[in-house]
Amino acid sequence: MKNNKSGKYLKYAFGEIVLVVLGILIALQINNWNDNRIANNNELKLIATLNEELISIRDELKINFESNNKNLKLVEEYLDEIEKSNEEKIIIISKLDTYRKSAVSHPIITNVLSANSSSSIGDNKLLKELRKLQLSYNEIKEWELYIDQLWNSKISDFLSRNNYAKSLVNYTRDQNYDDQDLIELYNNSEYKNIIALKWLIQNYWVREQRIALTETEKVIVMTEKK
């Protein structure tokens, strides 16, 4: 009798242990499933936020690229020394030194790619494209620094030193200006050399903007498929 009772107790205890273990395993499975679901939802939210940033960057880049590319063509027209009327020369000379700032802010991309970032994206292909995109944005910023330096060290100095700045400002503000000053500036060989330097920098700068715009469009498509 005692042996039978002991056997029953052992079977009962074993059954209880099995049930407890199964309960723990099920709880762990549910917990893992919840963790995965939360992680997946967080990733989708992050990608949605990333998509918004990319669209904003794309729109900004497009405006800046079109403006700077148009100005680049104007510089080329000036350097090619195509015959122009005095009125056309004044219009051209008033725009040669201009450019539109194009360095973009991308905090979400920076956060995603940060080595210490807790916001992870599991898609390695997307991460690879984001790294390429970040490099492209950095290239724009670097070339923009070069063109800023040229403006600060060469263009503004030349215009001030030769008293052309006031005529340009007056023309831009639609006030009285000396058109002969502007024609003289248009024909100035030193200024033409400075603008040629601007073209060299701006050509690479605009190219990087074009590349970044194309790459941004590509990554937008990738994020919208998620």
Identify the role of each PLM range:
Residues M1-K11, N32-K226:
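Long, hydrophobic alpha-helical segments that serve as membrane-spanning/inserting helices
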